[in-house]
Structures are given as C-alpha cells and as structure tokens.
Swiss-Prot record:
A biological process from GO: fatty acid biosynthetic process
Domain of life: Bacteria
Entry protein name: Putative inactive phenolphthiocerol synthesis polyketide synthase type I Pks15
Residue segments, region Disordered: 474-496
GO MF, any single term: 3-oxoacyl-[acyl-carrier-protein] synthase activity
Family matches, as PANTHER family: FATTY ACID SYNTHASE, INACTIVE PHENOLPHTHIOCEROL SYNTHESIS POLYKETIDE SYNTHASE TYPE I PKS1-RELATED
Keywords: Transferase
Residue ranges of domain Ketosynthase family 3 (KS3) in the record: 46-469
SMART domains recorded: PKS_KS
Length: 496
C-alpha cells in the first residue's frame, strides 16, 4: 500500500512537472513572439522612408524635378515682373514709398506660367465647378497625378488603398474674389481643407487627407506628418507637399508695410546685401513609402528620408520673431530621430529668406549645431533655393527637398545666388559653416550623401528633415508610358 502511494505520488509529481514544463515553454514562445513584435514596432517607428516619385511646378517653366534641377544647377534667377494676366492693377500697385497705403514698393516676384490652366475633362470636373476651384486645388490634383506616374504607379490602381494625402497650404486669396454665379461651388472650391480631400476623392484614396497650415513651414510639416503616418502603419503610401498661388497681390502690400521685401524681388540669403525676402509660388509633391515596402514592390528609390522633427518657438521675442534656441532643438531632435550625428550631414538647404533678422538667427543656430566639432576644411555647406525663385511660401519646404534629392542624385551642391559676401551680422568664425557661393562637387568617402532641409513658419512652427541618397543607384528617369487606364495623361503630364 505504501509502495503504491509512493508510486502515485511520483507519477503525480511527474505530471505536474510536465505541465509546468509545457506552460513555461508556452510562456517562452509567447515572450519571444512579443519581443519580435516589439522589435518590429521599434524598427518601423524609425524606419527610413523612401522618396519614390516627384511632381512639381515652379517659376521659370519648371514642370518636374528635372526642370527644377536645370534651374538650380545652371544658377538661373527666375524672378520676373508682376504678371499681366491675373487682373492685377500692375501700374497702380507700385509706389517706391514703403508707407504708401495700399501699395507695394516692389514690382518683382517669381510666378508660375499659366497658373490657372487645368485639364478639367481629364479629372471629370464640370466647367462650372472648375471656375470656383482655387488654382491651388487644381495644381495639387495635377502634380499629385504626375508624382505617382513619376513613381511608376498607375494613379487609378490606388482606389480604396490606405494612401494618405498631406498638403501644406495657407494662402486662399482666390476665395476673396467675386464668386457670384458659381452655383454653390465656392465653399469647396476655396476651402484649404479640400485641397487634400479633393485629391483623395478623385483618386479614391482612403488614408488620411490633411491640409497643413503652419505658414512658411507648411509643406515640410506635411512631409513630417506623412512620415509619422507611414511609420505608425496608418497609411502605406503618402502624397506629401505643398502649394501656393498668389491670386491677389495682397501679400506684397502687407509685407511692404513691414518693410520686409527686397525692392528687386531677389532673396539674397545669408549675404551682406540681404535686404528682405522676395515672394514666389509653386507646387510640389513627393510620393513616400516605407523603404522596406519600396524594395519589396520594386519601386525606384530616389532618396531616403532618415528622420524629421517639428517644434515651436514658444514665448520668443515676438510672435513672428525666430527663436534660435528652438531652431537648435528641432535640428537636434531630427538628428536623433534619424539616428545620426551632426557630422553625418554634408549640406543644409536652409530656410534662408534673406531678412536681416531671420538669416543671422538661422545661421547662428546652424553654427551652434552642425558647425561644432568638425574640421574647418570640411564645413557644413549652406544654401537656399529662394535665391533662384523667391520664397514659395507653403511650397518652400518641398521645393528644398526636391532640390536636395536631385543634388544627391547628380553629385553636385548648387550655388546660392546673389551673395556678394557672407553676412557680417553672423559670426562665421564660431563654427565650421560656409555658404555655397559657387557650385561644388559633392564627393563623400565611403558613406552616403546626406542633406538636411529647414523650414520656419511665421507663426513659430519649425521643421527640420534629414535626407540620404538612395541605397542603390536609381535608374535614369523616364516618362511612364500612358496606359488605357490613364487615358493618355501619362504622356502629357509626366515631364520629368
């Protein structure tokens, strides 16, 4: 009897041990799976985002990324006199006296050719509705389509997909015009929220559609949000960028009162001769995708966005006054988000508006971050596309991104125009930072080319983004042949 009880006790213990073993084995497997999911989440949260397509329109006849590169690589200045086809009282607007009421002391800006042109039939929009549509909405439809074609993606294939649209836009002067007789389309035609929503509607996209207004930093903030959405899994593809079309000359009049404009309309970024900003306009969209997805789907990678950050000036010297410490912080956070150090970045496409207050503050922030610790013979290079085509406002950030993507692909850092000599308002000896007064070959030793882009909004919202050249050489750009599904638009709109 005692022996039987002992045997039963041993068997019971063995069964308990076996149960415990299987339980612990199950827990170990679940723990491994949890760790794997956590690693995947952490990797996705910091995964580089690929730029797989670009669409844009800018002054000087720029109708694609190759056109923009032609302008900046040739050192062209595309500023011109006020257009005569917008109904502006060009002669009556001008007065050299900055205090003249309702006048502007400049006749110059950088303007789009045929800013109101639009293929309404292709997009299936009735003529009566098109008349009520802000040209900015029309442009976003066209450059979004072009950007997808540039990426080799049939726009109509995305219907029902988790594709997001993030549009930087803040000027809505078209809505101030007489909209009588437009049959109720005025509200949707001039709403900045619809600039994103209309792209999603026309293409049938079901990811987030967000219009971003942080003034001059709008398009870079839009790209930052698109990156965050991709990394979180909220969307699988994103169209991000910005647009500005000056339907009325009110921004010239307003900034003339503040004496913030250059009389000749030229942005002389970081120059001793800097005397104010010059206004421009344009539209740009980049197609963004998680790098792992771009590789899996065989999409050409034009460049990689390694990291980005957005912050606010807070209580600075004034609502519209830049905050140098906040600019330093946004740079540091963007570098941390990218997993890089300041020494890993070769060039910064600066905000560089050529104002006597803003440029010195921005330069000092760059000197205090990127300019420290590196050899003087290998400085951080600084430039600004605003010297070519003015301050394109809500499209300024994406213009800088496109410029830097193209510069990395061509291996050249373009010159910044109108710099007679570096600004004496900046202590350039406090760090290793130099202005690109001439084009330079972009040579690197055993690592990828990297660039940063800055945008600062007049409301105090700052953005900074870190770009890296594509991990493998991208194939030469070629127009996407139109298919039956694109109705022939591929040949017409994919212009490089």
């Amino acid at each position: 009897m005692i022996e039987e009880q002992r045997t039963m006790s041993v068997e019971g213990a063995d069964q308990q041990s076996e149960k415990l073993f299987h339980y612990l084995k199950k827990v170990a497997v679940e723990l491994d799976e949890t760790r794997a999911r956590l690693r995947e989440y952490e990797q996705r949260a910091t995964e580089p985002v690929a730029v797989v397509g670009i669409g844009c329109r800018f002054p000087g006849g720029v109708d694609g990324p190759d056109g923009l590169w032609d302008v900046v690589s040739a050192g062209r200045d595309v500023v011109s006199e006020f257009p005569t086809d917008r109904g502006w009282d060009v002669e009556g607007l001008y007065d050299p006296d900055p205090d003249a009421e309702g006048k502007t002391y400049t006749r110059w800006g950088a303007f789009l050719d045929d800013a109101t042109g639009f293929d309404a039939g292709f997009f299936g929009i009735a003529p009566s509705e098109v008349l009520a549509m802000d040209p900015q909405q029309r442009l976003m439809l066209e450059v979004s389509w072009e950007a997808l074609e540039h990426a080799g993606i049939d726009p109509l294939s995305l219907r029902g997909s988790a594709t997001g649209v993030y549009t930087g836009i803040f000027a809505a002067s078209y809505g101030n015009r007489d909209t009588g007789g437009l049959q109720g389309y005025g509200l949707t035609g001039t709403s900045i929220s619809v600039a994103s929503g209309r792209v999603s509607y026309v293409l049938g996209l079901q990811g987030p559609a967000v219009s971003v207004d942080t003034a001059c930093s709008s398009s870079l903030v839009a790209i930052h949000w698109a990156m965050s959405s991709l990394r979180s899994g909220e969307c699988d593809l994103a169209l991000a960028g910005g647009v500005t079309v000056m339907g009325l000359p009110s921004i010239f009049v307003g900034f003339s009162r503040q004496r913030g404009l250059a009389a000749d309309g030229r942005c002389k970024a970081f120059a001793a001769a800097a005397d104010g900003t010059g206004w421009g306009e344009g539209a740009g969209v980049v197609v963004l995708e998680r790098l792992s997805d771009a590789r899996r789907l065989g999409h050409s990678v034009l460049a990689v966005v390694r990291g980005s950050a957005v912050n606010q000036d807070g209580a600075s010297n004034g609502l519209t006054a830049p905050n140098g410490l906040a600019q330093q912080r946004v740079i540091q956070v963007a570098l941390a988000n990218a997993g890089l150090s300041a020494a890993d970045v070769d060039v910064v496409e600066a905000h560089g508006t050529a104002t006597t207050l803003g440029d010195p503050i921005e330069a000092q922030a760059l000197l205090s971050t990127y300019g420290q610790g590196g050899p003087a013979e290998q400085p951080l290079w600084v430039g600004s596309i605003k010297s070519n085509m003015g301050h394109t406002q809500a499209a300024a950030g994406v213009a800088g991104v496109i410029k830097m993507v193209q510069a990395m692909r061509h291996g050249v850092m373009p010159a910044t125009l109108h710099v007679d000599e570096p600004s004496p308002r900046v202590d350039w000896t406090s760090g290793a930072v130099s202005v690109l007064t001439e084009a330079r070959e972009w040579s690197v030793d055993g690592r990828p080319r990297r660039a940063a882009v800055s945008s600062f909004g007049i409301s105090g919202t700052n953005a900074h983004l870190i770009l890296e050249e594509a991990p493998v050489p991208a194939p030469a750009e070629a127009p996407v042949e139109a298919s039956e599904s694109t109705g022939g638009r591929g040949r017409r709109w994919c212009r490089g």
